[in-house]
Design a protein with these regions (language model features):
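Acidic (Asp/Glu-rich) sequence patches and key acidic residues
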Residues: 1-138, 153-154
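C-terminal or internal capping secondary-structure element at the end of a domain, subdomain, or sheet
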Residues: 140-154
Length: 154
């Protein structure tokens, strides 16, 4: 049996640092009409299975296998922010978690042929402004937007 580790690098946030309310989550979701439909279907699917009782619970649950259409290991709040930004800004982010289960959302460099022209031209300030725009909808508290080195393994 072997064990391997992986590292993800990029500029972004620790999603777990965001303290928000259900009303603010719904406000964020409402910005992206296509994602909003998907989000409400996602909630319905969870409720049909008996989980969860509230949006707050949904935001902390690990994503279940049948909902892996976006990315594995994503929890609710990370999925919501990622979905909104991808639809509204056409910027693709990486959601990942570390050994301690803390979730991160990062703008990670990738092969240029996988990046849009918009992504290729983004500066550090552009990425900072992008995260700040969406995080500020969810909370008035400071959330660090910085270079992230996320390590995990399995």
């Amino acid at each position: 049996m072997s064990y391997s580790t992986w590292h993800d690098y990029g500029f972004g946030i620790c999603v777990d640092d965001i303290k928000t309310t259900e009303d603010k989550v719904f406000e964020l979701v409402h910005l992206a009409p296509n994602f909003e439909k998907e989000f409400y279907q996602w909630i319905e699917n969870f409720r049909e299975d008996g989980d969860p009782e509230s949006i707050a619970e949904l935001m902390t649950m690990d994503q279940i296998d049948k909902y892996e259409d976006r990315s594995c290991c994503m929890r609710g709040l990370g999925l919501i922010i990622k979905g909104d930004i991808e639809e509204c800004e056409d910027i693709h982010l990486l959601a990942c978690d570390n050994f301690n289960g803390c979730q991160y959302l990062i703008f990670s460099m990738q092969y240029p042929w996988y990046m849009s022209e918009k992504e290729k031209s983004m500066t550090e300030k552009d990425v900072y402004d992008l995260f700040n725009k969406y995080v500020s909808i969810l909370t008035d508290e400071f959330v660090s937007i910085d270079y992230q080195e996320v390590e995990n393994g399995g």
